[in-house]
Regions:
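Alpha-helix N-cap and loop-to-helix initiation/capping positions
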Residues: 137-141, 227-235, 366-370
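Charged, low-complexity interaction regions
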Residues: 273-287, 309-311, 335-337, 352-367, ...
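Repeat-associated, polar segments at repeat-unit boundaries in modular proteins
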Residues: 307-310, 314-325, 370-383
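A polyanion-binding, active-site-adjacent surface
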Residues: 2-180, 207, 212-227
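Short terminal alpha-helical segments
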Residues: 253-310, 371-374
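Short, charge/polar-rich alpha-helical segments
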Residues: 326-342
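Heptad-repeat amphipathic alpha-helical coiled-coil interaction surface used
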Residues: 262, 341, 345-349, 355, ...
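A hydrophobic alpha-helix/topogenic segment detector
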Residues: 179-254, 261
């Protein structure tokens, strides 16, 4: 674990929890501390416990009231987790915001029903309402916790901050001496080319701050204003898709996923024996594992899906970009070199998702003919060129 001035990141985090708890127990705060919370925020129990190297931090406004009847199921889960029981935060939790979050994260390749060390969930305001779960948010609550939130970001050092709602965005940007215009609607802020806003940690490392709609009922209604489907998440899924290029271009992911994957594909390309094995592979016939290729392919496929590279809306993207199926199937070098980032990603997803099962070849035939390598190299080239 990285250290700052000789103090471990874990020790910094534990000291932050102690300082926040002391501030709320001082009696000078309108909001209260929740004694069941052994983390900096109750949302950490969903994604965040031990995730001090998380790359994506989800930021809400405030958690609400843990003593409210609607929070009873979650609080039982948290109490069980404090006792060392293997219980999910989301168990028996039918909160519409949380259920929508599951769907939105799934749309970018994350399964938040399981523990994911890349994610850290928190609220900007770290205290708790005595009653009521939403509405009547006070700027003074955020101002009181701004110092603590900035410390949290400096400890975790995420690449991406996902801000749910305008008040959350304004609070987060305020910690970094940045602002958001009050002259335009929040929907315009979300859709702006200036989203995300890039801020810097104290050592100059960039953090990408995304404006997103709150995915509760009211936030979803506001995001869908002017559309016929008031509770659809489609607009929000399009908003969330903008997060992926920033996530994919993370230097950590470049080193641990993109570069090793491309190296593996180049080794196959250079070996006639390995290419022949890929061409002959079938899930319906016994195969001798050639130099661990079966294991290598499984890991490659798992990592590609896990990192959200196999986008679900690839067909919609192909149609939008007028990409011809035959050209996508061949993925010839000269053509691939003309593709935009989203075009190349859509083509790669096509090769992963199209029906290989009639011949049982899975992705292997697209690897054998070099299509996957050419597309991966194109994506990598565009990612490293991102500002």
């Amino acid at each position: 674990m990285e250290e700052d001035g000789g103090v471990s990141r874990n020790d910094q985090y534990r000291q932050l929890i102690a300082d926040v708890r002391t501030a709320y127990q001082s009696g000078q705060r309108e909001l209260k501390w929740c004694d069941e919370c052994q983390e900096v925020n109750l949302w950490n129990y969903w994604q965040g416990h031990g995730h001090l190297d998380a790359r994506i931090m989800l930021v809400g406004q405030d958690w609400g009231c843990p003593w409210d009847a609607g929070a009873a199921a979650v609080m039982r889960n948290i109490q069980a987790m404090n006792c060392g029981q293997s219980v999910s935060y989301i168990c028996e939790n039918e909160n519409p915001t949380d259920r929508n979050l599951i769907e939105l994260f799934h749309s970018i390749g994350f399964d938040i029903l399981t523990d994911d060390s890349r994610l850290f969930f928190t609220n900007f305001v770290m205290g708790y309402r005595v009653k009521g779960t939403s509405g009547n948010f006070k700027k003074s609550w955020a101002m009181a916790d701004a110092e603590y939130f900035r410390r949290l970001v400096e400890i975790i050092r995420p690449r991406i901050l996902l801000c749910l709602g305008k008040d959350t965005l304004k609070s987060v940007l305020g910690c970094f001496d940045s602002t958001v215009s009050n002259k335009v609607s929040y929907n315009c802020v979300i859709e702006s080319e200036k989203n995300p806003v890039v801020v810097s940690l104290s050592d100059g490392v960039p953090v990408y701050v995304f404006a997103l709609a709150h995915c509760g009922v009211m936030g979803t209604l506001n995001r869908n204003r002017g559309s016929g489907d008031k509770l659809s998440l489609n607009r929000q899924k399009n908003d969330w898709a903008k997060v992926l290029p920033v996530f994919w271009s993370d230097p950590l992911l470049l080193n641990t996923y993109w570069e090793p994957s491309i190296k593996m594909l180049r080794e196959i390309e250079a070996s006639e024996e390995k290419r022949s094995w890929c061409k002959a592979y079938s899930v319906y016939a016994p195969q001798t594992d050639k130099q661990g290729l079966i294991r290598t392919f499984r890991q490659f496929m798992n990592d590609t899906y896990k990192n959200g590279v196999v986008i679900g809306n690839y067909r919609e993207m192909m149609n939008r970009l007028n990409l011809d199926d035959q050209q996508v199937v061949k993925a010839e070098s000269a053509w691939v070199d003309t593709l935009s980032l989203y075009g190349a990603v859509a083509c790669l997803a096509y090769h992963f998702r199209r029906d290989h099962f009639c011949e049982g070849s899975l992705i292997n035939d697209s690897v054998a003919n070099g299509c996957v390598l050419r597309l991966m190299e194109r994506i990598y080239k565009l990612l490293v060129a991102m500002p």
